[in-house]
Amino acid sequence: MNLSDSKKKLALAGVVCGIVAACLAALGNPANMAFCIACFIRDTAGAMGMHQAEVVQYARPEVIGLVLGAFIISIATKEYRSTAGSSPMIRFILGVIIMIGALVFLGCPLRMVIRMSAGDLNAWVAFVGFILGVATGVFALKKGFSLGRAHVTNKVNGAVLPAIVVAILILATCTTLLKASQAGPGSMHAPIIASLIGGLVFGAFAQ
């Protein structure tokens, strides 16, 4: 694949995902959120009782679809393999910092772009911070910083997260064990089927 074809496919993926996000917002997702990885993980964590903020508790099918979409397409294209990174504690801490930073600015980079397209000035402030963060990371890499190489692990390991999200989907649709907000952003959501399909599309393109 040459660079031109790659850019065209990325542009097509961006257009499709943008349309999916707009459709999810029109079908009930928060208008200034549509599809946000950080926010949806927060909502799903709340649904499982991992935090007590009652306005952001809902098992988001988009997150489930995202994981399953990537998993299914990787198997279909024979690209599936399970890898594990080195320096797990550092990776964990960096992940926590990224999530806190995303939620402070009310969303992940995906939602940031969606909000920028709607003219939200706060998103533009976040964009400046995002650029500075990327520049800092590039500088660190050029200075030799590395977390070490990822290594291939047993394929069963890669199926653990898809199995977990399937279990969450079953609990969300077949039981009342998970929490669901009655007000606030957590109460605003598209129909489950539409959300799940949207997540599958995002996951497939991400893979």
Which residue stretches match the model-derived regions?
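Membrane-interfacial helix-loop segments of redox and metal-homeostasis proteins
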Residues: 1-207
